[in-house]
Amino acid sequence: MLLNIANLVGKHTIKFAQSVGIFALFSFIAISSIIKPPLYLSLIMRQLLFIGFHSLPVVAMTTFFSGAVLALQSYTGFSRFSAENSIATVVVLSLTRELGPVLAGLIVAGRVGASIAAEIATMKVTEQVDALYTLSTDPIKYLVCPRVIAAIITMPCLVLIGDVIGVMGGYLVGIYKLNFNSTAYLTSTFQYLELIDVISGLVKATVFGFIISIISCYSGYYSGKGAKGVGRATTSAVVNSSILILISNYLITELLFKV
């Protein structure tokens, strides 16, 4: 019994180590291929439109209502200690530092990551990736690099827009629901907001963009055969991206805001 358990644990450990090694090599090849010509600008522009512009409505709606709910919940808690004046500060700092980047990252991971993994996995199953080799085209350069570049560029833009919309949601709730003074609320919003708060969110967004794109491309590129392989690749891309987003969010916060 114990021998079987040890054997099972050993197999999974070796399999995990192999997956990590393959992923590290895949990431290294993708990063090194980015600086090599050609750039495939048309593919990059297409991915910029898909990852950035098409994700904007979902990100905007999510951050708007997150900011609104954050204002309501903060008022409920702070009113017990007569600290209602801190609501605007809590909303803007929470959104710029944490909620904005994390929510946008998870949304893009679910929407874009699944699509990227499914698309590349389908190309793998239908042997379109092999066809690129016959045309003397590097599939990683052609399929992976444009998506990685586009994700790194668009994620900070999505987060920045989402932060503004989220603060606007908190502002509207504060003014029209909680009856705050407009000038006082805006003053409190920007009083304690520092450049590092915004920069930290953009740094996180850039890292999240790389994580989502590289994991999704990896999941699709090394997918199994048939429809089941495509489904597993899609699920793996979303789950692994979401987990790494949360882990890297903590590590970046620990690095930038040392307590």
UniProtKB/Swiss-Prot annotation:
InterPro entries: ABC_MlaE_roteobac, Permease_MalE. Keywords: Cell inner membrane, Cell membrane, Membrane, Transmembrane, Transmembrane helix, Transport. It is found in: Cell inner membrane. The chain crosses the membrane at residues 20-40, 49-69, 148-168, 195-215, 237-257. Its main location: membrane. It is a multi-pass membrane protein. One of its GO terms (molecular function) is phospholipid transporter activity. The keyword Cell inner membrane applies. GO terms for cellular component: ATP-binding cassette (ABC) transporter complex. Belongs to the MlaE permease family. PANTHER family: ABC TRANSPORTER PERMEASE PROTEIN-RELATED (PTHR30188), PROTEIN TRIGALACTOSYLDIACYLGLYCEROL 1, CHLOROPLASTIC (PTHR30188:SF4). NCBIfam families: MlaE family lipid ABC transporter permease subunit (TIGR00056). Could be part of an ABC transporter complex. This is Probable ABC transporter permease protein RT0041.
